[in-house]
Amino acid sequence: MTLKASAIEKMVLFGDSLMAGYGLSNEHHLSVILEQNLKSEGHNIKVINGSVSGSTSSGGLNRVEWTLSESDIDLMILSLGANDMLRGINPDETQNNLEQIITIAQNKNIKVILAGMMAPTSHGFNYKKDFDKIYPDLSKKYNLPLIPFLLEGVALKPDLNQSDGMHPNEQGTLIISKTLQKSIKDNYLKP
């Protein structure tokens, strides 16, 4: 198979344990699966795992410059906030940190796809409402492609998650990879 030249040649997954491959062997990390899937469709795109387990949006902001110092990154898939939500961090703080990360990437001419999270109702109605609107609001403000919920089709499904019920297993990672792949193709790999 001949690999096609693409407007996207190198991308980084910038998130937390949900994208880092927590609990999975290296060959089952999301970055590896996504790169293989893109190549199987003829797209020669290097996918870098820039995700860190346990990372909050604040931690991401602290490391984004270093992560993006890798040369020639064309695209960042940003998915931070799950650990902020689990820790009850004020959604305004999370949104502010994500805005700064987006701005840093855009100032480097790096395209951004935003992959959102959703708070459970156990955090209370107001927290859920404020947290859940972070990602659509940022998508609109910065004109970013949005994956409304990174774990769509995976969350709360025991057969798609590890025994902790929070982190995707190999099968869950395949579903997330397909979700990311669709967004990349729809937004940046149009024929």
At which residue positions do the language-model features occur?
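Active-site micro-motifs of SAM-dependent methyltransferase domains
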Residues: 19-20, 40, 54, 84, ...
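Serine-esterase "nucleophile elbow" of acetyl-processing enzymes
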Residues: 3-53, 64-72
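Conserved G/P- and acidic residue-centered "switch" motifs that form tight phosphate/ATP-binding loops
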Residues: 15-16, 54, 81, 169
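Short, Lys/Arg-enriched, disordered terminal segments
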Residues: 1-8, 186-191
